[in-house]
A protein has these predicted regions:
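Short, charged recognition helix plus adjacent turn
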Residues: 1-4, 73-87
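A short, Lys/Arg-rich alpha-helix, primarily the initiator
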Residues: 2-26
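Short basic helix-loop element that most often maps to the first helix and adjoining turn
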Residues: 18-37, 62
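Recognition helix of helix-turn-helix/homeodomain-like DNA-binding domains
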Residues: 39-53
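DNA major-groove recognition helix of helix-turn-helix/homeodomain DNA-binding modules
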Residues: 58-74
Length: 87
């Protein structure tokens, strides 16, 4: 069960990173410029985009806001019985 939880966290971080990278590229911003806008080190941008960032939530939010994005929380969706039967 712990392994599955870690995989879910990993997938969430990878998805966040993909969204950050996509938004940055769409805006034509390089990592160094985004780092300046968010007042973080360029390394933070790289770690976020690769889904391996382990720093503070505040820094991640600073990067997200610098891209003109926001974070929305929603209840976790659990698999349906049909989805579980198909595994």
């Amino acid at each position: 069960m712990f392994y599955i939880a870690n995989m879910q966290i990993l997938n969430d971080m990878e998805l966040l990173g993909q969204n950050i990278r996509s938004s940055r590229k769409h805006r034509g911003i390089i990592q160094a410029d985004l780092a300046k806008l968010a007042a973080v080190r360029r390394q933070v941008i790289g770690e976020l985009e690769r889904g391996v960032y382990k720093g503070s939530l505040q820094r991640a939010l600073d990067v997200i806001r610098a891209l003109g994005l926001q974070v929305t929380l929603s209840p976790k969706r659990f698999p349906t019985l049909d989805e579980l039967d198909n595994e």
